[in-house]
């Protein structure tokens, strides 16, 4: 990210394929000024797919030392688990629905990570895919600074972004 000059406030990760990103952001890169305020969210679509390999294999491609392969970090049942790492280190965790967020805290659906999901339940939220176009219509939405439509969104939508950045204390 520093190479391309892009410094997001939040990095949104999806599933085991991106599980190492929260690990790097929260721990490995945290001391660096560029990454120090960056947050991460990991979304779980299907807990069955966790990205599990033996520890040595993950160490080879990740560069992570033994420290990270403990039961409270990436280790799960003597293997390395990339999704578990993402869940442990992410600032927030989302799933595809409120129901799924509750289900994965139970042994039957938890795929061996139900205890971790219960431990992180304060950071876990279900978000249903899709949108309610009646309620979230930028032409009529009373909660945004500037209404817009398909004809003027390039000019008007940016005003909402600037207002939100200002409200959140971010650089405008």
Show the residue positions of the predicted features.
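Catalytic cores of nucleotide-sugar-dependent glycosyltransferases that transfer UDP/GDP/TDP-activated
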Residues: 1-172
